[in-house]
Amino acid sequence: MFARLPLYLRLVRMDKPIGSLLLLWPTLNALWIASDGHPTWPLLVIFTVGTVLMRSAGCAINDYADRDFDRYVKRTENRPITSGKIKAWEAVALAAALSLLAFLLILPLNTLTKELSVAALFVAGSYPFTKRFFAIPQAYLGIAFGFGIPMAFAAIQGHVPLLAWVMLLANVFWSVAYDTEYAMVDRDDDIKIGIRTSALTFGRFDVAAIMICYAATLGIYVGIGVLLGFGVLYWLGWAAAAGCAIYHYTLIRNRERMACFAAFRHNNWLGGALFVGIAAHYAAGSF
């Protein structure tokens, strides 16, 4: 069992934390806004650890679902299931165990949060299969990656206000932007194997679509900032995030594979900038 631990860690991408961070930033935004800048330490631990666990479970399910496709994609041909180092049933069992651990974490929270977690599990588990049917599965991914937002509001406020759903919508636009950059890396392979992605759906308008999605994300956060009366520290964070989006354009405009992948990874800084702006605003108001 312990000898196989490195394989399991590779399966759930513990060596690639970018995915967990892309889930974590929107969740932290929600925790700070829902609590007026004062989330409790237990909630921070529950949602942070839960985010890592569910992202890991999602990776295991994704590799299970894509096991017959990954062998034809250069970037994924050596993944543990595809290479035969881990059996398919092991990935399913690991995903189930991680999901159970994540659910156990939220047992102290209210009923609404638990109910939302069931919906979150369904969306996360079904996402990998949407690549067979949906023209833009990245939008579905945005819902999966953003479910921590309504759950955070439910845990703190006991209900899910309209603001939470607006923040989730912003996350959908952001996910379409960064995961289209990711899909541009595999475009040629995806055409061969018949996987549907936003990069293929947008075609020659892929770069324009990405920038429109960034603009929509940032535009929604302008509305949030105005609605909540955020101060200059928030807007500095917002400006840094906008600068990241502009930088991404310089990376993706020529559609070079590694540059597109670099843009995808750089979204950690965009998400982090928005969170720092939100947290700084509330912190400044505490003094």
Swiss-Prot record:
Write down the superkingdom of origin: Bacteria
Q: CDD domains this protein is in?
A: PT_UbiA_COQ2
Report membrane topology.
Multi-pass membrane protein
Q: What pathway or pathways are given for this protein in its record?
A: Cofactor biosynthesis; ubiquinone biosynthesis
Instruction: Identify the InterPro entries for this entry.
Output: HB_polyprenyltransferase-like (IPR006370), Prenyltransferase (IPR039653), UbiA_prenyltransferase (IPR000537), UbiA_prenylTrfase_CS (IPR030470), UbiA_sf (IPR044878)
Keyword line: Cell inner membrane, Cell membrane, Magnesium, Membrane, Transferase, Transmembrane, Transmembrane helix, Ubiquinone biosynthesis
Taking the first listed entry, what is the main subcellular location of this protein, grouped into a coarse class? membrane
One GO process term, biological-process aspect:
ubiquinone biosynthetic process
A GO molecular-function annotation:
4-hydroxybenzoate polyprenyltransferase activity
For this protein, the parts annotated as crossing the membrane are 30-50, 89-109, 133-153, 158-178, 199-221, 267-287
UniProt catalytic activity: all-trans-octaprenyl diphosphate + 4-hydroxybenzoate = 4-hydroxy-3-(all-trans-octaprenyl)benzoate + diphosphate
Q: What class of enzyme is it?
A: transferase
Where does the UniProt annotation locate this protein?
A: Cell inner membrane
Where do the coiled-coil regions begin and end?
none
Give the Pfam families listed for this entry: UbiA
Has keyword Magnesium? yes
Q: Tell me its EC number(s), please.
A: 2.5.1.39
Q: Is Cell membrane set as a keyword in this record?
A: yes
Q: Which family does it belong to?
A: Belongs to the UbiA prenyltransferase family.
Q: Which NCBIfam families match?
A: ubiA_proteo (TIGR01474)
Describe its function: Catalyzes the prenylation of para-hydroxybenzoate (PHB) with an all-trans polyprenyl group. Mediates the second step in the final reaction sequence of ubiquinone-8 (UQ-8) biosynthesis, which is the condensation of the polyisoprenoid side chain with PHB, generating the first membrane-bound Q intermediate 3-octaprenyl-4-hydroxybenzoate.
Q: Kindly give the PANTHER family that the UniProt entry links to this protein.
A: 4-HYDROXYBENZOATE POLYPRENYLTRANSFERASE, MITOCHONDRIAL, PRENYLTRANSFERASES
In Swiss-Prot or TrEMBL terms, this protein is called 4-hydroxybenzoate octaprenyltransferase
Species annotation = Paraburkholderia phytofirmans (strain DSM 17436 / LMG 22146 / PsJN) (Burkholderia phytofirmans)
Name of the encoding gene: ubiA
